């Protein structure tokens, strides 16, 4: 989990400091864009900005995902992705959250009782 690095890189500008050097992170060449990914990250998502919307105190960037790289160690022999093992962090309304708790499976809200027991 890279909570401190995520916060630091989100708050500090790269104009005057090298965020990779400051946070002891390794740049990872991207496949579709010029900006590097982060080698230590379990998932890297490459995006191309489609639209920039000024919203007063903030700016919203709309982007298209053009490539996703996931570390192979988070897949089992059946090629199932194990999110719980990644330590992924998300940010919402000023707080960081650890991802991974399973809340349900696709179609659980309409599944018959017998099918629910199998999952």
Language-model features: where?
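Basic, polyanion-binding surface patches
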Residues: 3-119
């Amino acid at each position: 989990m890279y909570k401190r690095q995520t916060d630091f890189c989100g708050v500090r500008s790269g104009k005057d400091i090298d965020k990779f050097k400051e946070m002891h992170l390794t740049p990872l060449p991207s496949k579709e864009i010029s900006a590097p990914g982060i080698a230590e990250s379990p998932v890297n998502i490459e995006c191309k900005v489609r639209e920039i919307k000024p919203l007063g105190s903030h700016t919203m960037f709309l982007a298209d995902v053009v490539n996703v790289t996931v570390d192979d160690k988070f897949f089992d022999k059946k090629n199932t992705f194990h999110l719980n093992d990644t330590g992924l962090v998300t940010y919402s309304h000023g707080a960081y959250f650890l991802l991974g708790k399973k809340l349900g499976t696709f179609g659980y809200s309409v599944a018959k009782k017998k099918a629910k027991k199998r999952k």
